[in-house]
C-alpha cells in the first residue's frame, strides 16, 4: 500500500486549510447573495463589520455570519416574504384532485 503524499503548508507560511474550509466559504457566498435580495446592503455591511471586529478574518467568524444570516432569512421568510412559500397561507391540497375510491370513503 502506498502512503498518501504529505501535505505541505502554503508558501506564505500560513497553515494549510482543512477540506471543509472551502465549503464554509462557498456557503457564505451563497447565503450573502440571498440575503442581499431581502435586506438592505447597509445592514449587511454593518453586521459583517460587527462580526469581523469580534472574530477577525477567521473561519469562526464566517460560521457565525452564516448562523446569523440563516436565522435572519428564516425569520424574514416566516414573517411573510413575498419571494418565499415559507409562512404563506396554505393553498388547497394538491392530492384533492385525485378521486377517492368508493370503498375508502
Swiss-Prot record:
Q: Which GO terms describe its cellular component?
A: host cell; host cell nucleus; virion component
Q: Which GO terms describe its biological process?
A: symbiont entry into host cell; symbiont-mediated arrest of host cell cycle during G2/M transition; viral penetration into host nucleus
Name the Gene3D superfamilies on file. 6.10.210.10, VpR/VpX protein, C-terminal domain (1.20.5.90)
Query: Where does the secretion signal sit in this chain?
Result: none
Instruction: Write out the ranges of the annotated region (Disordered).
Output: 1-20, 83-105
For this UniProt record, the keywords arranged alphabetically read as follows: Activator, AIDS, Cell cycle, Host G2/M cell cycle arrest by virus, Host nucleus, Host-virus interaction, Modulation of host cell cycle by virus, Phosphoprotein, Transcription, Transcription regulation, Viral penetration into host nucleus, Virion, Virus entry into host cell
Question: What would be one Pfam family of this protein?
Answer: VPR
| Subcellular location, principal | virion
Q: Does the keyword section mention Phosphoprotein?
A: yes
Q: Does the keyword Phosphoprotein apply?
A: yes
Q: State the function annotated in the UniProt record.
A: Stimulates gene expression driven by the HIV-2 LTR. Prevents infected cells from undergoing mitosis and proliferating, by inducing arrest or delay in the G2 phase of the cell cycle. Cell cycle arrest creates a favorable environment for maximizing viral expression and production.
Q: Under what name is this protein listed? A: Protein Vpr
Species the sequence originates in: Human immunodeficiency virus type 2 subtype A (isolate SBLISY) (HIV-2)
Lineage, top ranks? Viruses, Riboviria, Pararnavirae, Artverviricota, Revtraviricetes
Q: Which gene encodes it?
A: vpr
Amino acid at each position: 500500500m502506498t502512503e498518501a503524499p504529505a501535505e505541505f503548508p502554503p508558501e506564505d507560511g500560513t497553515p494549510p486549510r482543512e477540506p471543509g474550509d472551502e465549503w464554509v466559504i462557498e456557503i457564505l457566498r451563497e447565503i450573502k447573495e440571498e440575503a442581499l435580495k431581502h435586506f438592505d446592503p447597509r445592514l449587511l455591511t454593518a453586521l459583517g463589520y460587527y462580526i469581523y471586529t469580534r472574530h477577525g478574518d477567521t473561519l469562526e467568524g464566517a460560521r457565525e455570519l452564516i448562523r446569523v444570516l440563516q436565522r435572519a432569512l428564516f425569520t424574514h421568510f416566516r414573517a411573510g416574504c413575498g419571494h418565499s412559500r415559507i409562512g404563506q397561507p396554505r393553498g388547497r391540497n394538491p392530492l384533492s384532485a385525485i378521486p377517492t375510491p368508493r370503498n375508502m370513503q
